[in-house]
Curated annotation (Swiss-Prot):
GO biological process terms, semicolon-separated: hydrogen peroxide catabolic process
Function: Removal of H(2)O(2), oxidation of toxic reductants, biosynthesis and degradation of lignin, suberization, auxin catabolism, response to environmental stresses such as wounding, pathogen attack and oxidative stress. These functions might be dependent on each isozyme/isoform in each plant tissue.
Lineage: Eukaryota, Viridiplantae, Streptophyta, Embryophyta, Tracheophyta
Cofactor binding notes: Binds 2 calcium ions per subunit.
Main location: secreted
The protein, known as: Peroxidase 3
Organism: Cycas revoluta (Sago palm)
Keyword field: Calcium, Cell wall, Heme, Hydrogen peroxide, Iron, Metal-binding, Oxidoreductase, Peroxidase, Secreted
EC number: 1.11.1.7
Catalytic function, reaction form: 2 a phenolic donor + H2O2 = 2 a phenolic radical donor + 2 H2O
Compartments it resides in: Secreted; Secreted, Cell wall
UniProt similarity note: Belongs to the peroxidase family. Classical plant (class III) peroxidase subfamily.
Length: 15
């Protein structure tokens, strides 16, 4: 994705 995935919650991984 290349953007912050808010669905990850506290993780905030860039996918």
């Amino acid at each position: 994705m290349g953007q912050l995935n808010v669905l990850t919650g506290s993780k905030g991984e860039i996918r």
